[in-house]
Amino acid sequence: LAKITDYQSLIDNVQDYLNRDDLTSVVPTWMGIVETELSRRLRDRRMISRATATLDNQYIKPPSTLVALRNIQLNTDPPSTLTQITPDVMDDKRASSNAFGRPAFYSHLGQQIEVYPSPDTGHTLEIAYYRTIPAITADAGQTTNWLIEYHPDAYLYGCLKQAGPYLGDQSITTTFNTYFEQAVQQIIQHDTDTKFSGRTPQTAITRIG
């Protein structure tokens, strides 16, 4: 078996494990399922991303890759962190006083982030969030990501457990789901350990809106 380092080597290893050479077209679908599941389950420090936007009304659309918010702040001097409140509390605040000023609270509901008070002028808003795991593809520049670089076993076992229903063999799913769950728990534990042994890596800030 070849070392798993990228998109193609993952496909090759999945086929080798299953002793098949006709799965090239379906393995990428399994990769996508693994990426989607782990995007929901993991809150790894390598998933942290940052984005900025000009906040000039009470609503702003979050980044399309967002799976969970971590922090929202106004890039004032000094920076001002917004406090998260529930949509119900936001509604109560609006009902009592639809004020304008420097935003101090936010609520996340569906595809919108709402702030309160409504901004009295344009502010630069910075959002720190957990983003989806970038999909790996055959396209140049997209054949690897942090998950396959640091945790290729999770990708492999996640793909292999998807092979069971496709091949009509439940034992494949049972076996590799066990390995997959072990790998996921090790990723979570590794991230927990590293949070207390060093700083969270710096992330590039993208512009939204």
Regions found by a protein language model. Give the residues of each.
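Glycine-enriched, solvent-exposed interface loops adjoining structured elements
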Residues: L1-G209
